[in-house]
Amino acid sequence: MSIIVKKLSKRYLSADGTETVVFEDFSAEFQDGKVTAVLGPSGVGKSTLLNCIGRLTSFGGEIVGAGEVAYVFQDDRLIPHKTVYGNIEFTLPEASKEEKASRIKSVLETVEMTDKASAFPEELSGGQKKRVSLARAFAANKDVILLDEPFSSLDLALKSRISADFTTMLEREPKTVIFVTHDVDEALTLADEILVLNDGRISFKISVEEPRKGRDITGKHINEVRKKLYEAILV
């Protein structure tokens, strides 16, 4: 379903009583079944926006349509005392044993982590943890997935690999996805729509018309979009 943010306000109070306004009267709409990337300089409220949509922080205004969401954090947040299988199973409390087994098998096969089902997080590499986090989010079977800097700690080869896993899972089960990133090429690879945040507002918005599967981010259209994005971010 579409997510509609209406007149969002969010402020933080520092220890010395100084108030920081992150959002004031902010509105946006995230289209049903689309992948939206949120770009912008550090400190403009990208992660705060996700936290508001995911109900992880208090806020003023209204957010319609988010419902229950799956969240992929920058630091993965796998449960250390549970195996890979257990971490994914944890998101399926109401499913039958057979349903859990089937769903977990499916997502682990997609990210090629079946052989790590009984491993604990401390036994996994950074890339493997990220793949488990994505698998867990899709296994939860929520309509909305939020991702905060999902690939920031990975090298280029791993980014490419995990981005491909992400695209494959979305082809099988379309979701409304919002992800925060500093990486313009990552946004161009994965997103249907890209927003640029500046000073608590959307300063630029553009659609990427080419299908995600097989998208050539070196092509003429994408290069034109890239140029506009850099201009918007560097304002």
Q: Where are the language model's segments positioned?
A:
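A short, proline-enriched helix->beta-strand linker immediately N-terminal to the Walker B motif
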Residues: 139-143
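Hydrophobic anchor residue at the start of the ABC signature
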Residues: 134
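Conserved ABC ATPase signature
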Residues: 120-124, 128
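Helix-to-loop junction immediately C-terminal to a conserved catalytic motif
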Residues: 54
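The feature captures the beta-strand-to-loop junction immediately N-terminal to the Walker
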Residues: 39-41
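ABC-type ATPase nucleotide-binding domains, specifically the catalytic core motifs of the NBD
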Residues: 13-16, 58, 86-101, 110
